[in-house]
A protein has these predicted regions:
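Sequence/structural signature of beta-propeller domains
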Residues: 1-215
Length: 215
């Protein structure tokens, strides 16, 4: 099941990246036959990280900032008529991610696309990860992994702020979910926090075109 999609507008092929909200979901790329016709034919792929069956980092061997070589495996039955796309990808070496959620495309200072996505339950502590994929060099980087609920607890929806920082919404069933910012170099800060007597998540963060207020 797909959770979120993001279109790489810098890509001549019009690649569409997709997350899968599943404890063993894959990270997908759809390349349309016609760039401006996303409901038409195309090819579906799943990401494979070299030497890594899953990206959950259960042994804490991957450190924040580590970059890993990737490739893409073909999903031959994208409509899953006989087998789930997840199973097709895993059989070919696709790497699984734990609870992939929000996704956004940004552009770095080299004018290269970078695709950020969250894994709400990923990481050694199970508190969440943020991954950054660079299609120009086919590497994926562990941008952030939480070790403490007080710092970062199950990031979900994400966006890019007008000043270039990554903004992440927490969704952890508590009554104090936070809105967290990350600079491009990974420095984290808290923008706000829910104050409620009930469990409340933050979602759908965006900015107005005027760049002066929250959307």
């Amino acid at each position: 099941k797909r959770e979120a999609v993001a279109v790489d507008i810098n890509d001549k092929q019009g690649s569409v990246y997709q997350t899968e909200d599943d404890p063993s979901g894959l990270f997908y790329k759809f390349i349309p036959k016609s760039k401006n016709k996303l409901d038409g034919e195309g090819k579906l792929y799943a990401l494979s990280i070299k030497g890594l069956v899953n990206a959950n980092n259960s042994k804490a061997e991957i450190k924040i900032g580590d970059s890993l070589k990737t490739s893409w495996v073909s999903i031959l039955d994208p409509e899953a008529t006989s087998k789930k796309t997840k199973l097709q990808g895993i059989e070919k070496g696709g790497t699984t991610f734990n609870g992939s959620e929000g996704i956004i495309v940004d552009t770095n200072n080299l004018n290269q696309s970078e695709i950020y996505f969250t894994c709400k339950s990923g990481g050694f502590a199970g508190l969440g990860q943020i991954w950054r994929y660079n299609p120009a060099n086919d590497y994926i980087t562990l941008f952030y992994e939480s070790k403490s609920k007080d710092d970062f607890w199950m990031g979900d929806n994400i966006t890019i702020s007008p000043w270039g920082d990554l903004i992440v919404c927490e969704d952890n069933d508590s009554n104090a979910c936070k809105l967290i910012g990350f600079t491009p170099k990974g420095k984290m800060y808290v923008l706000g926090k829910v104050s409620s007597q009930r469990s409340t998540e933050i979602s759908g963060v965006c900015f107005s075109q005027m760049e002066r207020r929250w959307g």
